[in-house]
Amino acid sequence: MFLVNNIRCSNMAEFPYTTVPGKIKPFFQKIQEAGLPSKVTQKWINSIGFTSSNDPSIIPLLKKLGFIDRSGVPTELWARYRDKDLAPKVMAEAIKNAYKELFETYPDAYRKDKEALRNFFASQTGKAENTIEKMIQTFKALCELADFESNSEEYPHNEVVPSREGLTTLMEKQTPKGLTINVNIQLQLPATTDEEVYDKLFRSLKRNLLSE
């Protein structure tokens, strides 16, 4: 009986959540306002005003969404989210990747009510009711920051793997005649604390590579 239960638990899915879902919106606003950190730590989170004992639970959420890597270093996704025009689409992309199984079950998961989400998370994770509630609140709060309705090809993007020396991005552009062009860009970022340098860099990439 013990072995059966152990196997069942190992097959349970994991979905991102934070114990402070009400902090999600103001935190992602800070991403756009604060400078680009070299590493996201509890100390850095405290420095931008998130000093509650539960606020560090945002860090695992950022990892699940792909905004930081395993060591806490901001990824290219973080840099793209700093552009307020791109942010809603970037968030939608991150949510779909983090909640892949949910969107496979419900392609319009962002429209589902709490009861449908509760049934899904409960059946997939086997977690306690209070944890399920945090999952629902987290998902709903993230979806409020996302744009799932715009043309998905407006800002096409493939999976990104951060490198130690800079940011590596793979962009895909669809030409009017249907020809797909893949552009692999490896950026050696300058050692600077001036976030404007990064902002200008990604604005230039957007203008020159993603324009019609």
From Swiss-Prot:
Protein's name according to its UniProt entry: Uncharacterized protein AF_1681
Superkingdom classification of source: Archaea
Organism: Archaeoglobus fulgidus (strain ATCC 49558 / DSM 4304 / JCM 9628 / NBRC 100126 / VC-16)
